């Protein structure tokens, strides 16, 4: 989080101006601190823009064996649509073939959540995430499947609460059937 009070004043004023433009009464008790809360929420949802990626810890292979794919399904994450700054609820499944060492499970999940914490276009994000995982996991192969429910088409525009968008990317030699549950329940 950004802790400089002076730095936060400008975006908070911007939120106040937006609320006034929309016709909101800024003196209502429930709205008094909304600009501060909104800025704090945006900081949290975009922390991947400011924080360094989490360090990945590797465990050595204790015997000489060729490992098959490791699959982690349905990692929950939240991004923002870069066009509307509305949330995208994500379920991300990844598979990787370890290279020189096995990355810790929690570190892989943290890396995926960090990567998602920014404004994205899902198609481009999926490709970038595959490249990031290939590099950070020192993998021989990576496969990524991203299932997203975009609030920009869920609550506005076409207002379709039943859709989800699925994107996939593959790097190296890997072919796994990945699944991911719809972030707002299964159909």
Swiss-Prot record:
Pathway: Cofactor biosynthesis; 7,8-dihydroneopterin triphosphate biosynthesis; 7,8-dihydroneopterin triphosphate from GTP: step 1/1. One of its GO terms (cellular component) is cytoplasm. One of its GO terms (biological process) is tetrahydrobiopterin biosynthetic process. It holds the Pfam family GTP_cyclohydroI. Keywords: GTP-binding, Hydrolase, Metal-binding, Nucleotide-binding, One-carbon metabolism, Zinc. Zn(2+) binds at residues 81, 84, 152. The keyword Hydrolase applies. It catalyses: GTP + H2O = 7,8-dihydroneopterin 3'-triphosphate + formate + H(+). InterPro entries: GTP-CH-I_C/QueF (IPR043133), GTP-CH-I_N (IPR043134), GTP_CycHdrlase_I (IPR001474), GTP_CycHdrlase_I_dom (IPR020602). Its EC number is 3.5.4.16. SUPFAM superfamilies: Tetrahydrobiopterin biosynthesis enzymes-like. One of its GO terms (molecular function) is zinc ion binding. PROSITE patterns: GTP_CYCLOHYDROL_1_1. Belongs to the GTP cyclohydrolase I family. NCBIfam families: PRK09347.1-3. Toroid-shaped homodecamer, composed of two pentamers of five dimers. This is GTP cyclohydrolase 1. It comes from Pyrobaculum aerophilum (strain ATCC 51768 / DSM 7523 / JCM 9630 / CIP 104966 / NBRC 100827 / IM2).
């Amino acid at each position: 989080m950004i802790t400089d009070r002076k730095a936060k004043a400008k975006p908070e004023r911007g939120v106040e101006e937006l609320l006034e433009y929309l016709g909101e009464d800024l003196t209502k008790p429930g709205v008094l601190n909304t600009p501060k809360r909104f800025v704090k929420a945006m900081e949290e949802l975009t922390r991947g823009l400011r924080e360094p990626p989490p360090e990945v810890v590797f465990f050595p292979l204790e015997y000489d064996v060729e490992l098959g794919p490791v699959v982690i399904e349905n990692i929950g994450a939240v991004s923002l649509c870069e066009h509307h700054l509305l949330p995208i609820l994500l379920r991300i499944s990844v598979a990787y073939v370890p290279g020189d060492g096995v990355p810790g499970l929690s570190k892989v999940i943290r890396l995926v959540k960090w990567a998602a914490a920014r404004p994205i276009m899902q198609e481009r994000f999926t490709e970038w995430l595959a490249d990031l995982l290939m590099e950070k996991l020192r993998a021989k192969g990576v496969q990524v499947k991203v299932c997203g429910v975009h609030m920009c088409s869920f609550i506005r525009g076409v207002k379709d609460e039943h859709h989800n968008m699925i994107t996939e990317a593959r790097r190296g030699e890997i072919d796994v059937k990945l699944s991911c549950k719809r972030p707002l329940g299964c159909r």
